[in-house]
From Swiss-Prot:
GO terms for cellular component: nuclear body. One of its GO terms (molecular function) is DNA-binding transcription activator activity, RNA polymerase II-specific. The lineage of its organism: Eukaryota, Metazoa, Chordata, Craniata, Vertebrata. Residues 1-34 have a biased composition (Low complexity). The gene is Atmin. It comes from Mus musculus (Mouse). Residues 1-62, 210-284, 603-625 are annotated as: Disordered. The keyword DNA damage applies. Transcription factor. Plays a crucial role in cell survival and RAD51 foci formation in response to methylating DNA damage. Involved in regulating the activity of ATM in the absence of DNA damage. May play a role in stabilizing ATM. Binds to the DYNLL1 promoter and activates its transcription. Residues 219-437 are annotated as: Required for formation of RAD51 foci. Keywords: Activator, DNA damage, Metal-binding, Nucleus, Repeat, Transcription, Transcription regulation, Zinc, Zinc-finger. This is ATM interactor. Residues 229-243, 603-612 have a biased composition (Polar residues).
Length: 818
């Protein structure tokens, strides 16, 4: 430090005993400096030897500027408006204004478009103090104007700012503030020697080599930054700390200022202590919340729709709630939540639900949703009130057939009136099955592009209703022509429970939320193109040993099973030839099947291949598209349902391709419970409201399978190629089929006059001999010419198929003797 002060004294003035250097000589030396004048060197630096200066190249002459006192004493300009017309930007000070002019407007010293980089050929500018006798005169100028101004304000300007503790005065407010930080303090060395300033203490330490105290190690600027940082931290922590922590007084405020020598604590120690205190006292700002609670009971104001992997809660058009997709994995842990746009949710029916709750007794592991299993949800929706919204087009409900949903299981006590404006739904005690629509075939082994899985949870104490429609083409505006759509409604009453055998599929009704294996899938397929091949799968019915029974003691009435086409939704396609076959399971049915099917092995999940011997070998080439039919003899014998096999003919004049290659497009109805007080369904002519409808196995059978070279058509030939589901009900069943078609959609052909209505009534008794299996009376017999209109070569099967279709015999042997 002494050497530095001596060097500063040498540079300020000639030391005693050293010859003074004339100003001209110093100016010449400055001019001969290779980089910059010696006056601009750092304080205490040694001058370069004369030999080095002489050998270096001569730089360009410097430009010395001596500002006036008025310029130096002028106050610093703030909030300066840009001088360029139209700019309007306000700069905080003059240097910022100059930088703005150069960077934004390319203006510098009145020159348009100057280069940003300084020209190295220009002479450097230096600024000297204008006060005579000042050591920072022309011999020791400053390299910047701000430096000479700072020097002038500190050394020569009027000292207007006085300290309140002492008599010192300062020319600038900043100097006074810096002085007040150390005014009255004593800086003591570790040896005990006190000093009035930190600078004097540092000089002492440099001379003696003593250890600097910890409180004086950091410079004042760093201390100020640390103190401001700590102050900001305290202000932010006060917002989160409890009131008890805020009441604690600060340690530095409690300390008295009386002693002249103030021992300061270590800055690092104080920082660490404050950090520790903050970490302990400050609670987390945002406590962690679980993404989804454990779904024991959920109240949802949204209708329910399910895609293949996860269930979807879709809002209505008027609802402002966000749709939520809830996924549940196998380990009973809630998965992720996805947001679904409302355009996707427009596929579901518009339902206004009161509450959606999961059963508390249902384990969460039973709500898993595998793609290959038919049952994958346990969502139960209770709908309270009906909607009075006007009837909308079905096309607005279903945007595209590519948006698919499958494997839906619901227990709906009410539904929207969008689909049935002409009749109100039942009371809150009724149950409604939801609709499903998909473009993927999961459980069919024929060339069908569409498969629907619909399962209905039906309490035994409720009369249930079902909307079970597979839709490929609602209207021409929404779908491509050529699709076939059919909606059926069914009602049937089970009047006795004393003699009834436990119904196999009732396990779905009682234990749908308790056992995954007690359910079965229900595919319903509609053929659109013979080139589309869908995936196949096998599904069976639940075992017969399920102890729960659907039947209840109800007064015996004539139940009606109604099938009718929905002509209002399909103006371009007419559905005809509705055939109903009802088979009740008897104890010796297995023997009959075994005798009629000697060449067919009936195992669990067995499939009938295309290469079966017998009538299949003589099929024409046009019927080769038929694949195997899923047939399970054990589930076939243990099932309890009424299976409806429907052949439908597309009589549209626009369709010229033989679409009647494959028949038995739809398989409808399981066990039906009806109520005499049910109101008719809005879209069906002369049909009762749906009771309980459980879709069963899908079958699609080529009519050529009914052909045989032998003059006789055995019952096994029918059952082998059709997936019949047997019924063991003790109640009498009456089946009525109505297929009314508007005359405007039918071509003016004689052979199609009789196609306008086909009505078949079938009476069957569960525990009577097998001879009464087909007791059928036909009120209207469909002519065989309607099958010839589809360009199918069925000339050899007219008599055989008409016999199968009408079934006018009173005994079973009459069917097999054709």
């Amino acid at each position: 430090m002494a050497a530095t002060e001596a060097a500063a004294a040498d540079s300020a003035g000639p030391a005693p005993g050293v010859p003074a250097t004339p100003a001209s000589t110093r100016g010449a030396a400055a001019a001969s400096s290779p980089w910059r004048p010696p006056e601009s060197r750092l304080q205490g630096s040694r001058p370069r030897p004369a030999r080095a200066r002489a050998a270096a190249p001569v730089p360009p002459a410097r430009e010395l500027i001596q500002p006036t006192v008025s310029e130096l004493s002028r106050a610093v300009r703030t909030n300066i408006l840009c001088t360029v017309r139209g700019c309007g930007k306000i700069l905080p000070n003059s240097p910022a204004l100059n930088m703005h002019l150069v960077k934004s407007h390319r203006l510098q010293d009145g020159i348009v478009n100057p280069t940003i980089r300084k020209d190295l050929t220009t002479a450097p500018k230096f600024y000297c103090c204008p006060i005579k006798g000042c050591p920072r005169g022309p011999d020791r100028p400053f390299s910047q104007f701000s430096l000479v101004k700072q020097h002038f304000m500190k050394m020569h300007a009027e000292k207007k700012h006085k300290c309140s503790k002492c008599s010192n005065s300062y020319g600038t407010e900043w100097d006074l503030k810096r002085h007040e930080e150390d005014c009255g303090k004593t800086f003591q060395c570790t040896c005990g020697c006190p000093y009035a300033s930190r600078t004097a203490l540092q000089s002492h330490i440099y001379r003696t080599g003593h250890e600097i105290p910890a409180e004086h190690r950091d410079p004042p600027s760093k201390k100020r930054k640390m103190e401001s940082y700590l102050q900001n931290q305290k202000l932010s922590s006060k917002t989160t700390e409890p009131l008890s922590d805020q009441a604690a007084p600060r340690q530095d405020a409690a300390e008295p200022d009386a002693p002249e020598v103030k021992p300061a604590a270590s800055l690092e120690d104080s920082c660490s202590a404050h950090t520790k205190k903050q970490s302990v006292a400050t609670p987390p700002r945002c406590p962690q919340k679980l993404l989804l609670p454990k779904p024991k009971v959920a109240l949802v104001k949204l209708p329910v729709m399910q895609f293949s992997p996860v269930p979807v809660f879709v809002p209505t058009a008027e609802s402002s709630a966000q749709p939520v997709v809830l996924g549940v994995d196998h380990s009973s842990a809630a998965g992720t939540v996805h947001l679904v746009p409302l355009s996707v949710g427009a596929l579901i029916l518009s339902l206004d639900s009161e509450a959606c709750s999961l059963k508390e007794s249902l384990p969460l592991s039973k709500i898993i949703s595998p793609v290959v299993e038919p049952m994958n949800t346990g969502v139960q929706v209770n709908l309270g009130k009906s909607l009075c919204s006007p009837l909308q087009e079905v096309g607005s409900v279903c945007q595209r057939t590519s948006i698919s949903s499958s494997n839906v299981q619901t227990d709906l006590t009410y539904a929207s009136a969008n689909l049935i404006p002409s009749a109100q739904w039942l009371g809150p005690d009724s149950s409604v099955s939801s609709c499903s629509q998909t473009d993927l075939s999961f459980d069919s082994q024929v060339s069908l592009p569409v498969s629907v899985h619909t399962q209905t949870l039906v309490p035994s104490s409720k009369v249930t209703s079902s909307i079970a429609a597979q839709t490929d083409a609602f209207i021409d505006a929404c779908f491509q022509p050529g699709g076939v759509s059919r909606e059926t409604q069914t009602s049937r009453m089970q009047n006795r429970t004393n003699d009834s055998v436990p119904v196999g599929h009732t396990g779905l009704c009682g234990d749908i939320f308790e056992s995954v294996h007690a359910s079965y899938s229900v595919p319903t397929d509609t053929i659109m193109s013979s080139s589309l091949v869908a995936e196949t799968g096998t599904h069976g019915l639940p075992p017969q040993s399920d102890p729960k029974i659907l039947g209840q003691v109800m007064e015996k009435s004539a139940p009606v099973l109604n099938f009718s086409t929905q002509n209002g939704l399909l103006p371009a396609h007419t559905m005809t030839d509705n055939q109903t076959q009802t088979i009740d399971l008897l104890s010796d049915l297995e023997n009959i099947l075994s005798s009629n099917l000697p060449g067919q092995t009936l195992d669990n999940r067995s499939l009938l291949s295309d290469t079966n011997p017998g009538p299949d070998a003589q099929l024409p080439a046009g019927s080769a598209q038929n694949s195997g039919i899923d047939f399970d003899i054990e589930e076939f014998l243990s099932a309890s349902n009424i299976q409806t096999q429907t052949e439908e003919s597309e009589l549209s004049s626009m369709s010229t391709e033989p679409v009647l290659e494959s028949l038995d497009i739809e398989t409808q109805t399981d066990v039906l419970l009806s109520d005499p007080s049910t109101q008719p369904y809005g879209f069906r002519a002369g049909s009762g409201f749906l009771g309980l409808e459980m879709f069963d196995t899908q079958t699609q059978t080529d009519l050529n399978f009914f052909l045989d070279s032998s003059p006789h058509l055995p019952l096994g030939s029918i059952l082998k190629h059709s997936s019949f589901s047997m019924s063991t009900d003790s109640s009498d069943t009456e089946t009525q089929t109505e297929g009314a078609c508007p005359a405007r959609h039918l071509p003016a052909l004689e052979s199609k006059v009789q196609l306008s209505s086909t009505e078949t009534q079938t009476m069957s008794s569960g525990f009577e001999p097998l001879g009464n299996l087909f007791l059928t009376s036909n009120e209207t017999q469909t002519a065989m010419d309607d099958f010839l209109l589809a360009d199918l070569a069925w000339n050899t099967m007219e008599s055989q198929f008409s016999s199968v279709e009408t079934q006018t015999c009173a005994e079973l042997h009459a069917v097999s003797s054709f």
